[in-house]
Amino acid sequence: GLKTACVESRGALGGTCLNVGCIPSKSLLNLSENFHKAKKDFNQQGIEIDGIKLNIDKMMTNKNKSIQVLTKGVEFLFKKNKVTYFKGKGVLFSKNDIVVYESNNKRTNVKSKNIVIATGSAVSSLPGIEINEKNIVSSTGALSFDKVPAKLAVIGGGYIGLEMGSVWSRLGSEVT
């Protein structure tokens, strides 16, 4: 195969989906569904559990462990397949030249006949609304609340918005 290099600025492989998208969202969907079933459905099925309570710290730790296992798996595959991994940002200087500014302040020049640009996604803001990750959060922030918000308005009907609405509703938020 081709000699391959990957430049990733996030510091963890796997892109948006694995780090702040599909995977953490699905993890929280599963965990919140389990909580909801234990709290609302089990009793109707003859399974009685007293004192069910949510430990959001443990839930987030579980979600983060899922992400870590998968990112380490991607890193293992890179090593196994001899993919050079640069932690930093790449700047395209010509059709065959990339300068990589690594997170350790090292600068590396990479020449390549073939270049794939896969920039991932970034959070979009709305005009006049500042995302501060406190009371106005991005989808990334909604994946990492340290407590269940009493009320939550979700703007956007993409899959992450829908899933975050489901997660936080199951855990006790009033979601609009």
Please tell me what each predicted stretch does:
Residues 2-3, 8-148, 176:
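Glycine-rich flavin
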Residues 146-176:
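Rossmann-like NAD(P)H-binding beta-loop-alpha module
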